Amino acid sequence: MSSGYLTVCVVGAGPRGLAVLERICANERQAASRTAVTVHVVDRARPGPGRVWRTDQSPHLLMNTVASQVTAHTDASVAMEGPVRAGPSLYEWAVSLAEGGSSRVAASGRESGFLAEAAALGPDSYPSRALYGCYLEEAFDRTVATAPAHVRVVTHRSLAVALDGEASEAQTLTLADGTRLTGLDAVVLAQGHVPALNSPGEERLARESRARGLVHILPANPADVDLSAVRPGEAVLLRGLGLNFFDHMALLTLGRGGRFERSGGRLVYRPSGREPRLYAGSRRGVPYHARGENEKGAHGRHLPVLLTEETIARLHRRSVDGERLHFGTDLWPLIAKEVESVYYAALLGARGEGSGVKEFTDRYLAAPPGGAEQDLLDAYAVAPAERWDWERISRPYGDRVFAGRDDFRDWLLGHLARDVSEARSGNVSGPLKAALDVLRDLRNEIRIAVDHGRVEGNSYRDDLQGWYTPLNAFLSIGPPLSRIEEMIALLESGVLDVLGPGMNVVIENGSRESGGGASFVATSDRVGGPPVRAAVLIEARLPEPDIRRTADPLLAYLLATGQARPYLIDGACGTSYETGGLAVTERPYRVVDAEGRAHPRRFAYGVPTEAVHWVTAAGIRPGVNSAILGDADALARTVLRLEPAPAPADEPAAQDSDFSQALA
């Protein structure tokens, strides 16, 4: 241990900020690096859940991960140098909460609701986001309470707005409440989703909507949206059919007092009369696939047989040698083959051909694409209708054009019923959901393969961001099957209608036939019939992470002052693709300024670095070598090895008395 003091600031107190704090405490507990360590944690929301997982949001908003596969704690699977400090998964914590209660939950004002949810929660249940927030609050409290005696944690319920300091000197962080945290030896940005400015197109539509007296709700977390202006019975357009759509669907039905009941084996919606009339659509025109019922337990996952560590290392060597990878030719064939092999293995297993499954899988993985694969499927009597078809799965309606909304609704109800049936078959036993779950299980491998510009810029933009990422979301990170059942019930009740593929929305002035006044007018490219007119349009999606349009004052300040820049990916012929991600180095993720210099005392990981890293919004899973926890440990250990920074020449060294202490 060296004598002296170290002062660190973590900006963002959600799951990533909590992980960094916990890793600092765990490493200091194992071997103290200093006489005293002070960690400032800055977030205007309560530390632990942060804003996204706050405990006062609607109980109708669910996670899309089962309770046993959610954690905030390290385990032996995490590849890291620091010590393991085990803790309960969300499910294990909920069991203890139901049995013994919690002072933190008791203080929430919603104790009875949380205790009832915890008591009913199973390992494969989907918890409310608010309950996860309670879990994170307790994890933060426990981390602070068990911190080594020489580690002091100071929380600041404010927003960071500016960061200054040369690379050779202590850093100064300014908060919105006027507090200046000086003498910082390191600053870690651990932010999640941050607010964004409107795109030019969004701003034009918002401005025109206001001028016409229409309600246009821009992309946002549904928990943050005020829906009080939406009147019972009025037509509401929702643009988007992903997870955000299902949140709005729940808030505008269950949140308005409606109920779902089982009747004759089917789910039926009992309206309250306070619901609006919902019309939803998107470019694809169908909702995300339901998640298959979990058969993998807490830690199970598909282990790659093609996209292995050895394969990724070989691809990386090519990248180091100057040969940029192309997602469509270097990675997609491996991903597709893995998915297809799992599908056929489950299909043959469901037919009772268990003894021949391994031989088939080995032969299929070795077969070149095309005729050899089809010959093998013929040999195993896999009928053409049973064969995997990426086009059919991604566009289940094919080239069909529907006569009208009734025609499309009938088709959609059949499609959704099949999706529910497939989901009930499970993510191991059910061929379709077992295959789609491979996409989720391969995220870590894909992330390792593509991160830090290893894929050529144009391919990253077009093949990965433009094509595969939305396809992956549609197929593998959808809602619980209960949400699809609810959607069916709402369609059958008439509360919800889906417009179909190729949704288009414009603003038109009213006509005598439409009752006068301006309205949003929605149509579908593939569904005939009259357009839908509404005075409310909800953009049912989150803003895309893009620091060039960030409304976060700290990130905007760093960008405006040249202390940060967007991440560039080298492309073909000397070009580069400018992403919306915050540029950082490889692990431990030092922030890079406008001149390309890495700052030795500033670090960042999380959603703002999307494009440097792929799919940064994924959560922390136990037992599968969580990238977030490994990153947090590397960040913590790097910070703890830093030499204390000298104060700027024009500013005296900070004293402990300078710091506000608002431990919550």
Describe the residue ranges of each PLM region.
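Redox-cofactor-proximal catalytic regions of oxidoreductases
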Residues: 47-115, 599
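Flavin (primarily FAD) cofactor-binding/catalytic cores of flavoenzymes
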Residues: 1-57, 106-110, 115-643, 650, ...
